[in-house]
Regions:
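Acidic, metal/cofactor-coordinating or nucleic-acid-engaging core segments within structured domains
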Residues: 56, 208, 214-268
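Covalent nucleotidyltransferase
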Residues: 139, 187-191, 208-218
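Short, flexible loop segments at the rims of nucleotide/cofactor-binding pockets, characterized by
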Residues: 123-132, 248-255, 280
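Extended hydrophobic/aromatic segments used for targeting, binding, or gating
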Residues: 160, 164, 168-201, 285-322
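SIR2/sirtuin-family catalytic core signature
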Residues: 1-19, 33, 43, 254-336
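Gly/serine-rich nucleotide phosphate-binding loop at the start of the catalytic core
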Residues: 1-149
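Short secondary-structure boundary/capping segments
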Residues: 22-35, 167-172, 205, 290-291
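Metabolite-binding pocket within alpha/beta catalytic cores that recognizes anionic/polar moieties
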Residues: 19, 127-187
Length: 336
């Protein structure tokens, strides 16, 4: 019997984009421009559309956030807000600034956006299409292969489509920080998730808080549930896109990141690493670098799945590793 090996998978937004493309929902679920559906996202108190509006997000709106912006302008505004939030923990006092208020609005908006997206698309109705998707085949193969000891998936996505996919095909998994037992497939979510629930507030009392986004919280303040989603958490466990989770100093995220670092350091040259759909923006690459730099440089099986991989990430991989392969989609994953 061949010696068992481990598989480390790092998933970015491209994984979810590919899934929506596979089931024909890319037009309804816009993951490239997070403001595009803002006028349709319901305000939790009233459940009426218009979360992204001057009425509900006056600070984001004042900074230029609009549902009709193109994705480049939308990303520019998000990066401005997050860059200010990243620097904030270095100050002893939080001042009442528009970018800080906008950050709170952005975090609450993203929670509502991804809950809205999840309710809008029932992936179980696309089981036939997903059965033939490269990622589904690959994950099923890994789970069934006795030569694979562990499959560690680091997901930088808030959504629960990965978990719902595994549930749909009866593939066991566990969630780091929440599961009492560790399955062969173990998922780490250092950027948080809409499935991380805290104490709930009454719907009629819903509002955007002034400070909760920056207060420190621990993993044991949350529970995991990917089926019963809502937007009524008193505390949201989300690090907005382009946010540096290490600088925002959230204990729940730090615990998960530390587990990933230890995991990356234990990889051997005969193990496999798969990187999919990672943007590698300048404000979030520090976290990714932390994981990559812990891996052995002589690892034999390193694959990046991305139709348009960032050149700067290519440069980093060439610097850190002796070899790697780039493939445009998941079709050939099982052959590598």
């Amino acid at each position: 019997m061949a010696s068992q090996k481990n598989v480390f998978i790092l998933l970015g937004n491209g994984f979810s984009i590919d899934m929506m493309k596979t089931i024909g929902k890319s037009d309804e679920i816009n993951l490239n421009n997070l403001f595009a559906c803002g006028a349709d996202v319901p305000w939790p108190e009233t459940e009426t559309p218009g979360f992204l509006s001057f009425q509900n997000c006056p600070n984001l709106w004042t900074l230029g956030a609009r549902p009709y912006l193109d994705k480049e302008l939308a990303l520019e505004i998000i990066e401005e807000v997050i860059t200010c939030a990243n620097i904030l923990p270095q100050r002893t006092e939080i001042k009442d600034k528009i970018y800080i208020r906008a950050y709170n609005e952005l975090e609450q908006y993203l929670m509502s956006l991804f809950v809205y997206y999840t309710r809008k698309v029932d992936i179980t109705k696309a089981k036939g299409k997903l059965k033939s998707w490269g990622w589904t085949k690959y994950l099923r193969q890994l789970n069934a292969d006795s030569n694979i000891k562990t499959v560690s998936i680091v997901s930088l996505n808030y959504d629960v489509w990965l978990e719902n996919l595994l549930d749909m095909f009866s593939i066991p998994y566990s969630i780091d920080g929440f599961s009492s037992t560790k399955e062969k497939i173990h998922i780490y979510k250092p950027q948080g998730s809409i499935a991380f629930h805290s104490t709930k507030r009454d719907r009629a009392a819903y509002s955007i808080p002034d400070r909760n986004s920056f207060d420190n919280h621990k993993l044991d303040e949350f529970r995991y549930d990917n089926k019963n989603l809502d937007c009524l958490n008193i505390i949201n466990a989300l690090i907005p896109p382009a946010g540096d989770s290490s600088r925002l100093k959230q204990s729940w995220s730090a615990d998960i990141r530390n587990h990933i670092k230890v995991l990356a350091k234990t990889l051997k040259k005969d193990d496999s690493v798969v990187i999919c759909g990672v943007s590698y923006w300048h404000v979030d690459r520090k976290e990714i670098d932390t994981y990559l730099s812990e891996m052995p440089s002589d690892i034999k099986h390193l694959v990046m799945v991305n139709p348009n991989p960032p050149e700067v990430l290519n440069a980093v991989l060439m610097t850190l590793f002796d070899q790697y392969v780039v493939i445009p989609n998941s079709t050939n994953l099982m052959k590598l």
